[in-house]
């Protein structure tokens, strides 16, 4: 071998290793999604959120092995729309492309996990498991095959539709599934209040830890370098992808900070975290095909778009999305896909390129409207397909095993009602009745006689007495000392969170 052959072999091996490292980074993004969703929701549902994110990957892995991958990568497509599944993963073990399987698997899991946040705090765990199986088994693989089939058999591939890392295939599909699910499921108890004049007021139900949300955001941003960069085939392209994957979310976050500062009087922390993710989603389709100016504009629009969409869904359409998943993933998945038709430079590193390595340029780079038209056609087709399929899936679940928990289960929290978990933070916030640190059962107070207590001298009545006291957290110490002074030494303490009946 001469020096060039040795260099080519080393480069090929290096990128093969990087490909698997990238897949590992994408897998680690599951932790980021779990932290974002947990932080943006209430503490009483934290364990349920973690469990759903875990099952997304584990159930999805089995479904993707059984059918999903073979359906997506079929060599025998009918009109470029749906493939006849192959069974190479079972029958051709020694020659099977395991690297590609692992990479596509973690992408599939990402699409599935987006829905968790939008349907958080009121979805039956069993119903969510069925959904997770359905999207990984058949919903995602079909549309992903339109764009990413290895044999080039997908109908959008043949049109040279560009989605390098999944703004459309992953994020708009996951976001559309989240939107459909949130609509069919309905809002959380106490989220919306209807006034006498018929107007509907949106009540803020805050998450329990902005710190966890921020941690999740940084984990996702870190993982996104593998998400976007793993498929790069040369170092120049990889560096460009990394740069665009930095520019777009940074710009989106700064623009969102300024926008919310002007609009609301103060910069919104939670919205800025979502803006970072929105910028990442938006640049994903064109990360290998746009330049710095394109990345700046894509990120700037994403920073405003996420806030506007979240506000419209909440205040105007009254669709309850606890973490803003629809605004982040669907809206910016659509925007990022269309933006390729505007800002693609006509050169780069993309799996949808022509045989000579080139592809259509965008409208603002001398390519005319052809690529823009292809991008719009592709995103509309993908989203319509996702909306129809997910409506069928969620309606089937709703009318069979049921999609939503009971009001009582929702109020006490998914952790205890679905998993028997007293609290994800058992050492800090007990959510089950306790006396002197020990869990106690519920007391039937229906037949208890009212008791009176003299402040001067506490006298035992021989009866249980239940008194409910609601106080501000900063006054709890005074309440506890006062109760002790009159002889009350044991009490159950529960942190009230939420709105209306939740408090």
Where are these regions (language model features)?
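Positively charged, small/polar-rich N-terminal and surface patches that mediate targeting and assembly
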Residues: 417-424, 434-503
């Amino acid at each position: 071998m001469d020096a060039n052959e040795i260099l080519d072999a080393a480069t090929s091996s290096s990128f093969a290793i990087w490909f698997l490292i990238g897949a590992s980074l994408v897998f680690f993004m599951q932790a980021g999604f779990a932290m974002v969703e947990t932080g943006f929701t209430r503490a009483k549902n934290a364990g349920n959120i973690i469990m759903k994110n875990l099952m997304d990957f584990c159930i999805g892995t089995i479904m993707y092995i059984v059918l999903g991958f073979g359906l997506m990568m079929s060599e025998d497509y009918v009109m470029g729309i749906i493939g006849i599944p192959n069974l190479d993963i079972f029958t051709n073990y020694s020659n099977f492309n395991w690297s590609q399987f692992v990479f596509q698997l973690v992408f599939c899991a990402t699409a599935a996990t987006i829905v968790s946040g939008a349907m958080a705090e009121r979805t039956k765990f069993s119903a969510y498991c069925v959904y997770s199986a359905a999207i990984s088994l058949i919903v995602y693989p079909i549309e992903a095959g339109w764009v990413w089939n290895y044999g080039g058999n997908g109908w959008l591939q043949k049109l040279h539709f560009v989605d390098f890392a999944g703004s459309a295939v992953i994020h708009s599909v996951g976001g559309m599934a989240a939107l459909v699910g949130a609509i069919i499921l309905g809002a959380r108890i106490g989220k919306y209040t209807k006034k006498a004049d018929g107007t509907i007021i949106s009540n803020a139900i805050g998450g329990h830890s902005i710190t966890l949300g921020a941690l999740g955001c940084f984990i996702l941003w870190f993982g996104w370098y593998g998400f976007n960069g793993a498929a790069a085939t040369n170092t120049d392209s990889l560096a460009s992808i990394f740069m665009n994957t930095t520019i777009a979310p940074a710009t989106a976050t700064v623009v969102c900070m300024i926008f919310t500062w002007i609009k609301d009087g103060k910069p919104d922390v939670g919205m800025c975290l979502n803006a970072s993710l929105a910028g990442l989603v938006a640049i994903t389709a064109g990360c290998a095909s746009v330049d710095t100016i394109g990345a700046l504009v894509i990120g700037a629009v994403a920073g405003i778009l996420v806030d506007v969409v979240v506000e419209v869904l909440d205040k105007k359409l009254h669709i309850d999305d606890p973490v803003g998943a629809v605004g982040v993933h669907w809206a910016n998945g659509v925007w990022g896909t269309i933006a390729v038709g505007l800002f693609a430079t006509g050169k780069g590193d993309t799996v949808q390129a022509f045989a000579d390595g080139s592809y259509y340029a965008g409208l603002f780079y001398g390519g005319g409207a052809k690529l823009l038209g292809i991008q719009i056609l592709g995103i509309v087709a993908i989203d319509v397909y996702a909306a129809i399929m997910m409506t069928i899936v969620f309606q089937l679940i709703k009318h069979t095993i049921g999609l939503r928990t009971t009001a009582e289960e929702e109020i006490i929290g998914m952790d205890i009602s679905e998993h028997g978990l007293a609290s994800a933070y058992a050492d800090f916030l007990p959510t089950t009745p306790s006396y002197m640190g020990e869990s106690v059962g519920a007391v039937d107070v229906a037949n208890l006689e009212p008791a009176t207590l003299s402040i001067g001298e506490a006298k035992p009545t021989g009866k249980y007495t239940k008194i409910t006291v609601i106080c501000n957290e900063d006054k709890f110490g005074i309440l506890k000392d006062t109760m002790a002074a009159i002889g009350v030494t044991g009490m159950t303490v529960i942190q009230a969170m939420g709105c209306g009946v939740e408090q």
